[in-house]
Amino acid sequence: MTISLSCDMMKDITEERHRENTMVKKFTTTQTIFTGWGALQENSAALSGLGKKPLVVTSAGTWKRMGAQLAEQLSGCFSAYAVCDCINSEPTDVMIAEGLAAYQKNGCDCLIGIGGGSPLDAMKAIAVGTTSSAPLASYMGKEIGGALPSMAAIPTTAGTGSEVTKFTIITDTKTDVKMLLKGEVLLPQLAIVDASLSESTPQSVTAATGLDALTHAIEAYTSKQAQPLTDALAVSAVKRIFSYLPAAY
């Protein structure tokens, strides 16, 4: 089936995008981002600037697959660190409470999230918990402010892009509601995006997170908040996903 647009329709679309692009837009993201094959090994020293003792937030599966590799990098940056590997694919307030308890018990002063979007989201929520005893549900619909512990995000999948966003989603186990928490303080200070870390990712996860990334790219391009900067990133992402996801899968 072929879909054609009339000249008038194309003109309307162009004019609408022009109006949107003349509006004042804001672009915020993580302060420092290292990307590329082997980025973690080459730039792991940057982690030492986070603090003295981090809590590593991850999943049991991720830590089992690459814990030895990650431990080598962490030991080169810190004299001690703690690990919370209780996060699964749907982080809940109960998991966040467990992570917060580990943070406090071990005297941690910063956070490192390693894994897919779930551990990175959980890291952000734990950071919020370190500054207040208020339940996470009380932050829904509000802009979170204040100073949080330093955070570094090390994604192992292409899915959510949580390492560069000011959002996190945590499930409230009492109401079964997915809570959206937001605030620029939730942006990590550091992101290390190392493609080599995705080599051991299961095939099904590679496919699912790749399509998730494609969805986010399309959403960004069609958003009313789109701007030339985000358009360039979105188009580049779509092209790369179509080129490389089939090969990676």
Predicted regions and their residues:
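Active-site segments that bind and position negatively charged phosphate/pyrophosphate groups
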Residues: K224-Y249
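ATP/NTP phosphate-donor binding region
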Residues: C7, T22-C110
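A glycine/threonine-rich phosphate-anchoring loop and its flanking beta-alpha core
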Residues: T131-P228
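FAD-binding core of FAD-dependent oxidoreductases
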Residues: I112-K124, T157-T160
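Short, positively charged and aromatic/hydrophobic N-terminal segments
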Residues: T2, M9-I13
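Short Gly/Thr/Asp-enriched flexible loops that form oxyanion-binding sites at enzyme active sites
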Residues: L100, P119-S132, V164-T165
